[in-house]
Amino acid sequence: MRFSQATVLAFAALSLAAPAFEADNKNIKREDCDKTSFHGHHKHKRAVAYDYAYVTVTVDGNGNPITTVSPVLSIETIAKSEETSSTSTSISSTTTIVQNDSLTSDEPKTLSLPSGTIKPSSFATESQSQSQSSSTGGSGSGSTNGIEGDLAAFEDPTEEFEDGVLSCSDFPSGQGVIPLDHLGFGGWSGIENSDGSTGGNCKEGSYCSYACQSGMSKTQWPEDQPSNGVSIGGLLCKNGKLYKSSTRSNYLCEWGVKKANVVNKLSETVAICRTDYPGTENMVIPTVVGGGSTSVITVVDQSTYYTWRGGATSAQYYVNNAGVSWEDGCVWGTPGSGVGNWAPLNFGAGYANGIAYLSLIPNPNNRDSLNFKVKIVGESGSTVSGSCSYANGKFNGNSDDGCTVGVTSGEADFVLYN
């Protein structure tokens, strides 16, 4: 039995978004995100967005599926029997994994935050509250090497976050947490307020989401999520102080699975923007890869990461054209801007049952081609099943439907090249 690739794409249209003000003369518009808005999620829900489900199944040597997959929506299945130049592999058991995009198919009118479910370990005394704990890294003005973060690749954080110490007006930089000051939220990646609005400052009753350096994910989201499908993530502002919203970790950031990197063979920098999920679903979390450089990229362990309505979720990324800065590219874009949710290409990355699934995904918002090519290749000594490449708006030569590989051992690279 040979492991091959079958990709299922399910598209469900979402609602439109209105632009705010223009940031510069490059047809890039930046949203007025520091103001609150009564909207189901981020007030600038991505225009004409889709829900993706990528399913990889085991097939026999003739490309016939061994398992039966029951998709939820109208689907198109593309089954291919391919091998990459790296070592081929045989898999003795059936492998089925769904990689869901972070979007929901409905946009609720109001944001329903969970109540009565946050159980911080204890409230700090007044004297404790007045002291800055070194474990939090202080406010957004602390030294964190900017969006690069303060940890070396796969260096674990060492200082735990303490409930009830930092004020809600402070941002917990450091230990993997990076500030996104350009968004206007005081360093936070997004704010979900108790009155159903999003944006503004981290204030009483709000869930304040944060970004982690590339290769890491935030650990904090309440177990009790709204029944309307909206996702909630981040720290809780309670009695003027910040508290963890989950007991799953005492650290705010955790590393993904060491399975993928981005190798930039171009001369220009490329900004790759992860959706803030669970949370406001902004595509604002940057992985920035300079020309001639390499960066780790987050591959989430789907057995331990956030689940949406019982289903596993993967990391999803928007890939901007080379030369677009991360400040301009990792935002909610507008039609014709070609940035943010209008960037031409998506990456997907998840890990389950010993296999990392890495995907190149078309963005139906923008069918224009990137100004560079992408291929997923196994590193030396790695085992990768399937092949996946993108050039001139097409996948694996002439397909419009994206592609996925399975990394069963070692690591693979998203290679960016001319």
From Swiss-Prot:
BP term (GO), one: single-species biofilm formation on inanimate substrate
Name by which UniProt lists this protein: Secreted beta-glucosidase SUN41
Post-translational modification: Predicted to be a substrate for cleavage by KEX2.
InterPro entries: Beta-Glucosidase_SUN, SUN
pH dependence (record): Optimum pH is 5.5.
Described purpose of this protein according to its UniProt entry: Cell surface beta-glucosidase involved in cytokinesis, cell wall biogenesis, adhesion to host tissue, and biofilm formation; thus playing an important role in the host-pathogen interaction. Has hydrolytic activity on linear (1->3)-beta-D-glucans such as laminaribiose and other laminarioligosaccharides.
UniProt keyword annotations, A-Z: Carbohydrate metabolism, Cell wall, Cell wall biogenesis/degradation, Glycoprotein, Glycosidase, Hydrolase, Polysaccharide degradation, Secreted, Signal, Virulence
Ranges of Low complexity composition bias in the record: 81-97, 127-136
Glycosylation sites: 100
Predominant place of localization: secreted
